[in-house]
């Protein structure tokens, strides 16, 4: 399980030196006063149940039918690899700071043509994120090369500033939701 201190740095709330005083990155949208309650949600990482989880996602997609999928972080890795196994069941994908990417050749289906990857702010604060945004762009480019409508939306380039890895918990999450809804509405 992650500690609050580890999450502070990894999720881009602030620097390690700023953790004990609660000093976030300037302009951070994360409600630092909620960190304790947020940390209560942390659970051990289950590394041996991935296949069972993928089977569950596929079963849900089969029951729902072709749909749009939104995923985040480690759930992005799980979901995107699952989509590559059953691209016929997904029409649109919105991946919020995913930790892994599908093989574009397996993920692109004539019916799954719309992909949006969203990345927040303060990426340069951690080499992990610098590498991840580069890999995200490579995934979008690979999907585009195969005929998909795939793009990376780096929020600061859209003047949406201060977002941590926990985009849906940040104070401006409604703004990100609106961007996502607009993107989906243009493609449905």
Predicted features and spans:
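Active-site signature of alpha/beta-hydrolase-fold catalytic machinery across serine-
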Residues: 81-85
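The feature captures the conserved acid-bearing segment of alpha/beta-hydrolase catalytic domains
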Residues: 95-155
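Active-site machinery of serine-nucleophile hydrolases
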Residues: 1-42
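Catalytic active-site module of serine/aspartate enzymes centered on a nucleophile-bearing elbow/loop
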Residues: 158-162, 166-188
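Conserved alpha/beta-hydrolase fold motif
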Residues: 69-70, 93
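Gly/Ala-rich beta-loop-alpha elbow adjacent to hydrolase catalytic centers
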Residues: 70-79
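Conserved acidic catalytic loop of the alpha/beta-hydrolase fold
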Residues: 47-68
């Amino acid at each position: 399980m992650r500690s609050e201190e580890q999450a502070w740095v990894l999720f881009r709330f602030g620097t390690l030196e700023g953790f004990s005083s609660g000093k976030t990155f300037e302009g951070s949208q994360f409600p630092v006063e909620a960190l304790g309650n947020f940390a209560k949600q942390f659970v051990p990482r289950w590394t041996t149940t991935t296949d069972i989880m993928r089977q569950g996602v596929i079963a849900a997609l089969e029951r729902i039918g072709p749909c749009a999928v939104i995923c985040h972080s480690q759930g992005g890795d799980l979901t995107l690899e699952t989509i590559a196994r059953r691209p016929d069941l997904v029409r649109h994908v919105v991946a919020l700071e995913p930790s892994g990417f599908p093989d574009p050749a397996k993920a692109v289906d004539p019916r799954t043509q719309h992909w949006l990857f969203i990345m927040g702010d303060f990426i340069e604060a951690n080499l992990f994120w610098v590498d991840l945004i580069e890999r995200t762009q490579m995934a979008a480019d690979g999907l585009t090369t195969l005929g998909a409508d795939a793009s990376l939306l780096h929020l600061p380039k859209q003047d949406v500033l201060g977002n941590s890895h926990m985009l849906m918990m940040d104070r401006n999450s409604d703004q990100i939701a609106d961007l996502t809804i607009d993107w989906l509405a243009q493609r449905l």
